């Protein structure tokens, strides 16, 4: 009986542990978690928590260590790739794509890159696109993982264009 109780406890907390271990994890918006690269176990934890989609901002040439799209789809979540390599990819077209996905997802979504910086950057532009002022949009991006001074400059420049 003791062993059964222990196993039940372990399986009950595994999804929570997986979610808590995401690299640079934050929840900058309700229903939107941003982070660095998750592994397969962390993705399984997200599926257990009811996440419906994973938005991968990493470029095609970036090594993930596993076939992320296959794992996400096998777990019953939608996989979306918005490849963002280089500062020119921090743009309002990609922000509009992100906005469309977030509006139609129907549940919690993970937005990730390698470290969380691109996730925060794109979330900033998305917030500006939907009508937030530049300061609020930037604050959302910072809350979403935007920590790189160089990328922040790019975001601030893009925000000032609107």
PLM regions: where:
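A phosphate-binding catalytic loop at a beta-strand-loop-alpha-helix junction
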Residues: 110-120
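N-terminal hydrophobic targeting signals that begin at the initiator methionine
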Residues: 1-2
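Cys-dependent protein tyrosine phosphatase-like superfamily
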Residues: 16-109, 124-162
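Bacterial N-terminal signal peptides
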Residues: 5-17
């Amino acid at each position: 009986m003791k062993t059964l109780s222990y196993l039940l406890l372990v399986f009950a907390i595994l999804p929570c542990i997986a979610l808590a271990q995401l690299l640079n994890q934050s929840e900058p918006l309700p229903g939107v978690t941003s982070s660095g690269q998750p592994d397969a176990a962390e993705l399984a934890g997200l599926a257990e928590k009811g996440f419906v989609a994973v938005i991968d901002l990493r470029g095609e040439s970036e090594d993930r260590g596993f076939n992320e799209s296959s794992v996400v789809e096998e777990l019953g979540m939608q996989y979306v790739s918005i490849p963002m390599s280089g500062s020119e990819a921090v743009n309002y077209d990609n922000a509009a794509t992100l906005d469309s996905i977030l509006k139609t997802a129907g549940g919690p979504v993970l937005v990730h890159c390698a470290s969380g910086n691109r996730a925060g950057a794109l979330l900033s532009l998305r917030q500006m696109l939907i009508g937030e002022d530049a300061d609020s949009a930037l604050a959302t991006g910072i809350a979403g993982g935007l920590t790189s001074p160089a990328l922040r400059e790019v975001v601030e420049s893009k925000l000032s264009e609107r």
